[in-house]
Amino acid sequence: MLISSRIVRSSLVNVPLRLSRCFTQAHRACKEEEVNSPLSSAAEQPEQKYTHFGSKTVLKSTKQKLVGDVFSSVANRYDLMNDVMSLGIHRLWKDHFINKLDAGKRPNSTTPLNFIDVAGGSGDIAFGLLDHAESKFGDTESTMDIVDINPDMLKEGEKRAMEQGKYFKDPRVRFLVSNGEKLEEIDSDSKDIYTVSFGIRNFTDIQKGLNTAYRVLKPGGIFYCLEFSKIENPLMDFAYQQWAKVLPVMGSMIANDYDSYQYLVESIERFPDQETFKSMIEKAGFKSAGYESLTFGICAIHWGIKV
């Protein structure tokens, strides 16, 4: 069974792309004293400065480099890594992701779409979206920004484009090194479709990344995310946990890289469950947020609409 839907939301693509009561004075004074105390400041400090890197706690300022090192290490074996981690099913998930979004300039439209694929250095999702738009709608005008913080991953995407002979040096396609939490090079209200596939869990600040996605999308634009998630079936979850214990060992055997695979397993474990991530999408300002769990919840498609 490939797909197990928790939420069924028909015709996603038909959605137009277009404190509390006061405390007493004494209680307030007490609270102010607590907030201003050194103990209170010390307690808040770790939350401000630290984040997780897999199962480890690290300074926020260092996580970007640590994650970058992981993906530089696996860049030239990225497809192999995904095959190992998902037993090859990631290819079916990605196909479903692209088909469900069903994006492209319709024949009766005069306005091409502006896509942005974040953490998309390998190019597989971006090129798949453009292929779908052309094959189904005859769309050869929509544009694609392929964004990744890691130059090594973008090189793999450019290599893929050159090997396929289709999108290499295509004026519609731009490869851009940029931090997905900021996207400083991308104008606000400029994109119709924002996609991110198996990448957002590696952000230092996921909520900040979601807020930025909302910023760069036009009103009516769609946020669309494919990410590992939380398994809903207890037996399937047990089987997956056993598999996860073996993955770093396989990474060592296949790619001579135990540590990177160990981090990737731990990053999946730390990512929010489906409902929590849906709430984060809504917190960023998106409406009509929803999700579809795939393969018992091993991964999920999440979406939201900017209104």
UniProtKB/Swiss-Prot annotation:
Membrane topology reported for the UniProt record: Peripheral membrane protein
Gene: COQ5
Gene3D superfamilies per UniProt: Vaccinia Virus protein VP39
Catalytic function, reaction form: 2-methoxy-6-(all-trans-hexaprenyl)benzene-1,4-diol + S-adenosyl-L-methionine = 5-methoxy-2-methyl-3-(all-trans-hexaprenyl)benzene-1,4-diol + S-adenosyl-L-homocysteine + H(+)
Entry keywords, A to Z: Membrane, Methyltransferase, Mitochondrion, Mitochondrion inner membrane, S-adenosyl-L-methionine, Transferase, Transit peptide, Ubiquinone biosynthesis
Enzyme class (EC, first level): transferase
One BP term from GO: methylation
Main location group: mitochondrion
Descriptive protein name: 2-methoxy-6-polyprenyl-1,4-benzoquinol methylase, mitochondrial
GO molecular function, one term: 2-methoxy-6-polyprenyl-1,4-benzoquinol methyltransferase activity
Assembly: Component of a multi-subunit COQ enzyme complex, composed of at least COQ3, COQ4, COQ5, COQ6, COQ7 and COQ9. Interacts with COQ3.
Location relative to the cell: Mitochondrion inner membrane
Pathway(s) annotated for this protein in UniProt: Cofactor biosynthesis; ubiquinone biosynthesis
Function of the protein: Methyltransferase required for the conversion of 2-hexaprenyl-6-methoxy-1,4-benzoquinol (DDMQH2) to 2-hexaprenyl-3-methyl-6-methoxy-1,4-benzoquinol (DMQH2).
